[in-house]
UniProtKB/Swiss-Prot annotation:
Organism of derivation: Paracoccus denitrificans (strain Pd 1222)
Keyword terms, alphabetized: Cell inner membrane, Cell membrane, Chaperone, Membrane, Protein transport, Transmembrane, Transmembrane helix, Transport
Gene designation per UniProt: yidC
Ranges of biased composition (kind: Basic and acidic residues): 624-635
Protein's name according to its UniProt entry: Membrane protein insertase YidC
Single GO biological process annotation from the record: protein insertion into membrane
Family the entry assigns: Belongs to the OXA1/ALB3/YidC family. Type 1 subfamily.
Role description: Required for the insertion and/or proper folding and/or complex formation of integral membrane proteins into the membrane. Involved in integration of membrane proteins that insert both dependently and independently of the Sec translocase complex, as well as at least some lipoproteins. Aids folding of multispanning membrane proteins.
Amino acid sequence: MQDNNRNLILAMVLSALVMLVWSIFFAPEPVPPAQDTPAASTQGTAQPEAGGPATPGAVPQGAAPELEAAAASSDPSANAGRVAIESSSLAGTISLAGGRIDDLELTGYRETLDTRSPFVRLLSPTAQTTVQAEGSPVAPGGGAELAVQKPYYAVYGWMPAAGTDPALVPGPATVWEVESGAKLGPGQPVTLRWDNGAGQIFRRTYELDDKFLFTVTQTLENTGTAPFSAAPYGILARHGKPDTQNFFVLHEGAVGMTDGKLLEKKYKDMTKLDPLPGEGPAELVEVQENGWIGFTDKYWMTTLAPAPGQSFTAVAKYAPGADIYQTEARMPVQTVAPGATGTSSSYLFAGAKVWEVINGYQTNPGIDRFVDSIDWGWFYFLTKPIFRLLHWLHGMIGNMGWAIIALTFVLKLLVFPLARKSYISMAKMKELQPQMEAIKERTGDDRMKFQKEVMELYKREKVNPAAGCLPVLLQIPIFFALYKVIFVTIELRHAPWIGWIRDLAAPDPSSLWNLFGLLPWAAPGQGSFLHSFTLPVLAILLGVSMWMQQKLNPAPTDPAQKMIFAWMPWVFMFMLGGFASGLVLYWITNNTITIIQQYTIMSMHGHRPDFFGNIRSSLPSRAKAGDKGGDKGGK
């Protein structure tokens, strides 16, 4: 019996260890105060845009303008014209100043569960002013006000090669004209044109599919009499550190793939990059054939992806003075002969990290290992198959909550051979209990002799006392992998289950504090000290399921162990109340299946757990009555 209790205690201790590690390593970091973005002076046409990114430094001359200087100049995009973007997934505008994509909303996702809440805004212009697309109806007051958000945008251009006048290439502040297309959408490309007046005509064509992928084609037509050399580039720029989850388990920051090698830099790590000549704090990686680079958030991402097979330089950099985080894709210099045209094509992903969509882009147009942009974590070898199985079950069932329950059954089925072996071993241990008691009486206080004879007994009866530990140990990586799936995959964001559970990626919103909504006051919100004591329904069910699982075995005789058993379910009930409801649902289902399995298998081997007897024996009133009865009998 002591071995059975030891296994249960091991399960509890390992689970507590999981919680302890979580609280130490995965706790949110304090969010630093937001830094104000410096404001700005008008620059001439081929100069770095105000408040915009520094021009790429991979210029043959080896010089890169300071980001601080760029951020200190005014933003011409505030007064430039705009072209509308409209699809079933995206809405926004392109600024003719630099041709930057700096105004983008995800129309399939809202900020909150409230259907009246605004769409998720992914990209924002440098100037927080009215944005009115050309050709679109004028809203009251002359336009639609954008929500206040730190500037975040994509911009393309050309860098002059050695000997080329920088004024002859379009930069982030160049004002383009629309050559064709009134609105960008699926099957509706838009082409912008800029003539440098010296014999070179630059064009930029934007195409958009029905999801989140832009195709950007830059051309350089040389109508002059001499060869012209320049290097195309793409930039993603974020002004100031964005609001992040700050969880150790989640990567937020620069992300990329460079010839099969994953590149990840958190925002705080980007500020600590080694300074490079002409660059500032930066990291440059030469990509020979396939790669991409961008920024990733928990659910959203922007990525620059040159055409497959295209060599380029992947750059992650930071400008301390302007507080701008930047990723770049710098293509090689092109020398265009008179009468010829140079072309550079690349892709821009700007949207939600939906597995099906990203996996589709990995196939067509062939963005290398694009699914690795989803943060699968340390246990990726478990996280990926668990997610795919959950995704398939969701497609079959149509409800993510029931899919999690079905997934739990499948996982328990996979580990059933080990669980069965464990429960059979526990039943055999019960059979050996009388012999172990006899050994204990015979050996007295000689612990070494007792252990030796017990091990000989196990060997003789072919019993493995450690068999019960294996299923428990196996649960730990499964738990972390499933947590990763629930925490980082957008498929669970705002996914409902039943009744009041409308978001399986968020904690259960019910609360014992107001009798689950029956009393006319609100429960303490997250961040409040009292929030830990609100006790949602799922947390209570978890505590009850853990308590019932304990009662399959008699309480240990050791007082310390008995106290651990008594408190552990209720401690976990409070600890896990703030976890994602999908994860708590998994744990409740897992405990319930474990109870049924253990009761059934042990009963089949002649040792049915005395569930109600164990409950009665653990009650203090019964223990006291037994003590009094014993005292009377002694008299």
